[in-house]
């Protein structure tokens, strides 16, 4: 299985974690705020 912080796809299985935004995260619900900066890149 994949460890936390490693890239993953919707089909890959993480070690007791979920695949959030293409990365294994043990706190998927709290990680929503980290996905917000993706929009800031477009503003540059």
Curated annotation (Swiss-Prot):
List the cysteine pairs that form cystine: 1-15, 8-20, 14-24, 19-28
A GO molecular-function descriptor: toxin activity
Propeptide residues, chain positions = 35-44
Tissue and organ expression note: Expressed by the venom duct.
Just give the chief location class. secreted
Q: Where in the cell is it found?
A: Secreted
For this UniProt entry, what's an example GO CC term? Answer: extracellular region
What keywords are assigned to this protein? Answer: Amidation, Cleavage on pair of basic residues, Disulfide bond, Secreted, Toxin
Q: What is known of its domains?
A: The cysteine framework is XI (C-C-CC-CC-C-C).
Family affiliation: Belongs to the conotoxin I2 superfamily.
Protein name (database record): Conotoxin Fi11.11
Q: Which organism is it from?
A: Conus figulinus (Fig cone)
